[in-house]
Amino acid sequence: MSTSIVGPLAEAKPRTERPKAYKVILLNDDYTPREFVVAVLRAIFRMTTDQAHGVMLTAHLRGLCVVAVYSREIAETKATQAVDMAACEGYPLLFTTEPED
């Protein structure tokens, strides 16, 4: 009679899902100077001057522009930092976040 020894089954690794992506959206306003918007985009979102200028113009012409896509926590943090930076200078610049489709 033979006896076979069976080792433990391999542990199943839990599947980790990618965090849901969130868009940071710049909303146009008629009060914040364009140069300041570019400065905020460069400082908070680490854009080049050309990239920031393009985003600013798109928001100006269309009313809004997606700035970047991040995980929820990072998107909300960056949007808050940008709004706070504008508020410190007395500008009503707004950034919002929403889930990416």
For each feature predicted by the language model, list its residue ranges:
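Terminal domain-initiation and capping elements
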Residues: 1-101
